[in-house]
Every structure is written in C-alpha cells, then in structure tokens.
Amino acid sequence: MSGASTFPGYRLRFAEPEDSKALVPLINVAFLPEQEAIEGARINEEKLRPFLSSGTFVVLEDGQGLAGCVYAEIRGKRGYIGLLAVRPELQGRGLGRLLMARAEEFLSGAGCEAAELRTVSARSSLVPMYEHLGYQVTGTSKMPAEVPLKIPCHYIMMSKQLT
C-alpha cells in the first residue's frame, strides 16, 4: 500500500484478524469526545466482529503499534467509511487524511463510485474536516434506539464521488 512514505516511520496496511485486540482500544481512545453525547465505550471485540467480516480496516502502524485506522466496506457501487481513529497525541498531523485516502482508494479500486460516511451531530466539528476532504452533507438520520444517548443527537450523513 503506497503513501506512508510521505510520513516516515509509519506503515499502511490492511488489518489482520490478530489486530482486533489493538483496534478496540485505539478506536475507543479516539472516540472519547463522543462520550459527552453517548454513554459508554464506542466499541468492544464483540461489536468489532461484524465489521471485520463485512469490510476491512486500513491501519497505520508506528513503532508503538497501531497509530490509526479506518473502516471501509463495499456496498455495491457505494462504499461506506467509518470508525476513523487516530491516537489523540498524533491527531492534527494529516494521518487521518492519509487513512481516508487509502480507504477511498480501496473502495474506488473495488468499483465503488462514491463513498458515504456518517458522523454524530454532537461532534459537528468533524463536518468541516470531512468537507475539506471533498465530502458533502447529504442529510441526517436518527440514531438507533439502542444507542444510549446522554443528549439528543443524530447522524450527519456525508458523501463523496470517487469516480
């Protein structure tokens, strides 16, 4: 996988099954700001399993282990991107942008014409970041009833043409 050479000391690759134990804490620490709106940890190994069987994770490694990840799933001509996570001390360095580019490259290579994602309205500060990457807001949707909300919020749906 190309691209990590622009970030010396990092290596991009697709996740292996043994990465699941490292993905859970990485995602949870990156999603800590969400806990102002949603009760509990973002993910556990049980909740991670369906992601691993339905799609793939692009992971970014450094000398300390996983530095970041993003989930990509092929859904016909439209791909889905989610669970973008970068260790907090590494955020703001362009690593999320690198991960998103590789996820989009994967989806495009699989024949997807567009990529879709969603973010929680309580983290609306993420919308400009995704817009900077070429995504546009396409609408909103309700949070599933089983999501333990602390405050009212919803999903902000976004999409980007890949071809």
Roles of regions detected by a PLM:
Residues 18, 38-39, 43, 94, ...:
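Residues at secondary-structure transition points
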Residues 106-109, 116:
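Long amphipathic alpha-helical scaffold regions
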Residues 30-33, 58, 82, 96, ...:
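Hydrophobic alpha-helical segments
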Residues 1-6:
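Short acidic N-proximal helix/loop "leader" segments that mark the beginning
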Residues 8-10, 14-20, 24-89, 100-102, ...:
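Acetyl-CoA-dependent GNAT
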Residues 65, 87-101, 110, 121-128, ...:
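Conserved glycine-rich acetyl-CoA-binding loop
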Residues 49, 57-58, 113-127, 131-163:
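C-terminal "cap" of GNAT-fold acetyltransferases
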Residues 79, 93, 156:
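Glycine-centered loop/turn positions within well-structured domains
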